[in-house]
């Protein structure tokens, strides 16, 4: 038996199926934070940096606040007053990076994504090994440079000890 396309019950059936797919599809709200930077044991460093997100883009100047603890957690905020441009968080098992002006965030488990130099800044400053696509160097003036050789994202800056 063939059912005509324009029947009211068919439109209702399609609506119910569409609603079912939306509810059963499983959406997850983006993680706001992996942890809260509060309490004793946090080492806070402040500084300034120039960030070029990728090849062909202009550099952005801003302030860095980096907080780390002995459990291996690190929080980095890069801001141009009054707005946060990048927030990066790493733990030994998870990572999260947010770009508030664009309303974008990326998160994962295990080693951080090699796509974002911000996720490796603390490790680079601590002298830890980096993925081959990242290059870190210290400068004679006490500053540093972290570069993603693939995307040509660069971070040039300094932080107080």
Where are the regions a protein language model picked out?
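Acidic/charged, solvent-exposed loop-and-adjacent secondary-structure segments enriched in E/D, K/R, S/T
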Residues: 97-126
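Post-signal-peptide N-terminal segment of Sec-exported extracytoplasmic proteins
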Residues: 42-85, 135-136, 144-145
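Beta-strand-dominated lipid-handling architectures at cellular/organellar boundaries
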Residues: 59-60, 67-72, 89, 94-96, ...
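A mature extracytoplasmic/lumenal domain signature
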Residues: 78-82, 90-94, 99-103, 110, ...
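Bacterial Sec signal peptide processing site at the extreme N-terminus
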Residues: 21-42
């Amino acid at each position: 038996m063939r059912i005509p396309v324009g029947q009211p019950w068919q439109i209702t059936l399609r609506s119910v199926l569409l609603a079912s797919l939306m509810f059963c599809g499983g959406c997850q709200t983006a993680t706001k934070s992996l942890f809260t930077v509060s309490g004793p044991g946090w080492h806070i460093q402040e500084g300034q940096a120039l960030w070029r997100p990728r090849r062909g883009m202009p550099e952005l100047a801003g302030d860095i606040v980096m907080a780390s603890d002995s459990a291996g957690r690190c929080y980095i905020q890069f801001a141009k007053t009054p707005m946060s441009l990048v927030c990066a968080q790493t733990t030994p098992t998870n990572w999260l990076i947010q770009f508030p002006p664009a309303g974008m965030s990326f998160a994962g488990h295990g080693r951080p994504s090699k796509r974002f130099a911000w996720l490796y800044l603390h490790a680079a400053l601590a002298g830890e090994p980096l993925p081959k696509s990242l290059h870190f160097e210290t400068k004679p003036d006490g500053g540093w440079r972290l570069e993603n050789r693939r995307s040509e994202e660069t971070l040039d800056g300094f932080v107080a000890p």
